[in-house]
Amino acid sequence: MPIHHAIVHLIEKKPDGTPAVLHARDAELGDSQAIENLLADLNESYNAKNKAWGFFQGESGAYPFSGWLGEYLEGDRDFVGFSREAVEHLQKLMEESNLSTGGHILFAHYQQGMTDYLAIALLHHSEGVAVNESLEVTPSRHLDLGQLHLAARINISEWRNNKQSKQYISFIKGKGGKKVSDYFRDFIGCQEGVDSPSETRTLLKAFSDFVESEDMAEEQAREKTETLVDYATSQARIGEPMTLDALSELMDDQQPRAFYDYIRNKDYGLSPEIPADKRTLNQFRRFTGRAEGLSISFEAHLLGSKVEYDEERDMLIIRQLPTQLKDQLKRRKD
């Protein structure tokens, strides 16, 4: 992972309304194994978080970040100057937010594959212990990437090459509530463009409809469900969106356009690229069971809506039966 530029600044700030104090670094971080390890660990932690996706607000006095980033990329200002301008803006926003807490601010411009990214993260320390060369236990401070709550990643290549994109920025949804992370989102100047949970739910609904329309056997439906969930999970793990083209090809290598064409013909309104929402995906695993000539299979998210389990009476109640099954039952009754 080539790292083009990286720098760290420090903002001291407590969530009590006290002024934010900036300690700015005046030179980039040099190449080292430590910074490579830091960025690798940061990406691993970041990819595991639930994120929102969006795009830059129109450049203005309230949202100047995209303008500074553009000037840096065009060579009109160096990386240190860009990061200094940005962190001073962040300092002001922190002072306006009583809930904000300071920390070390990492700016890193790096490349992964053929794609350029800018990562920005607010890092905090944790107190721990270590054993020194004299085999004594001593206090030790380290960056705690497990407590990463405020961070954003900008896909620079997507931003510059695809003007229609509305999902080239991702940022962590703060655990402390919307107001805690609002100032950081405003710092980036990001407007949410894609509702990841909603898009994921729509994709899963389209998949369920597709499986029903194809009248797939239970085993085939289960295999395709696993294919979808595995692909979506792997993309979420590396912080990349799913693409409908790639997913359709994975579904059926003999008819690689079948699922894609079904989605487009039914007009589900899905974007070509969909950020996977892991919580939504986890509800989509299938329940299956066989006994004495009976075979039951349904997606986990249907439990509690179309499927109800009555444990005391050892019963499953199924609502909205498939049309084909109802027709068979009616013919048998007649």
Curated annotation (Swiss-Prot):
Main location class: cytoplasm
Keyword Cytoplasm: yes
Subcellular location: Cytoplasm, Nucleoid
Family designation: Belongs to the YejK family.
Name of the protein described by the UniProt record: Nucleoid-associated protein PA3849
GO cellular component terms, semicolon-separated: bacterial nucleoid; cytoplasm
Keywords, ordered alphabetically: Cytoplasm
Pfam families for this protein: NA37 (PF04245)
Gene Ontology terms, MF aspect: double-stranded DNA binding; single-stranded RNA binding
